């Protein structure tokens, strides 16, 4: 069902995407404002750093291994990104998508300046526009490349000269 009062990109203060997948990794990406600065932030936590199979929320991911990278965004770039996310129909997604237990869990949330929060999550089930949302994130921070890195084992990182 379409909202009668659609959210405008200029009303958004934070957009966050979180996933925990079968590779034993958790990923949190967000585009947000801190004061007058717009940022894109990425945090990845490999679950072998903490208790086995412990479920993590996005804030825990940022605190376990810390923020992997943070880059400034212009307000125009953030608004274009927000417009792309809203174009995926996130406002109209169900609160929860239940499906097969494929060990993939995802959450997306949008926080508005009014305090309103729009959120959706799923376990093995996805709205039809999900890949459009992933493409919007990929355009912002190369998300597909990051998710491929998440599948790498510690030995793979060492092979590429990354300390683990």
Where on the chain are the PLM-derived regions?
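Short, well-ordered, aromatic-rich surface patches in folded extracellular/luminal domains
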Residues: 1-23, 61-69, 76, 80-164
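Short, flexible N-terminal segments of the mature chain
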Residues: 26-62
């Amino acid at each position: 069902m379409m909202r009668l009062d659609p959210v405008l990109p200029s009303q958004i203060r934070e957009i966050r995407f979180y996933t925990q997948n079968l590779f034993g990794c958790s990923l949190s990406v967000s585009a947000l404002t801190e004061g007058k600065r717009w940022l894109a932030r990425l945090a990845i936590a490999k679950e072998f750093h903490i208790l086995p199979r412990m479920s993590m929320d996005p804030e825990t991911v940022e605190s376990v291994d810390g923020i992997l990278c943070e880059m400034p965004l212009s307000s125009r770039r953030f608004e274009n990104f927000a417009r792309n996310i809203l174009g995926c129909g996130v406002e109209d997604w169900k609160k929860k998508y239940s499906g097969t237990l494929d060990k993939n869990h995802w959450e997306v949330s949008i926080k508005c300046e009014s305090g309103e929060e729009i959120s959706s999550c799923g376990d093995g089930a996805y709205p039809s526009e999900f890949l459009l949302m992933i493409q919007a994130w990929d355009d912002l921070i190369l998300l597909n490349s990051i998710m491929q890195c998440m599948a790498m084992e510690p030995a793979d990182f060492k092979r590429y000269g990354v300390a683990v």
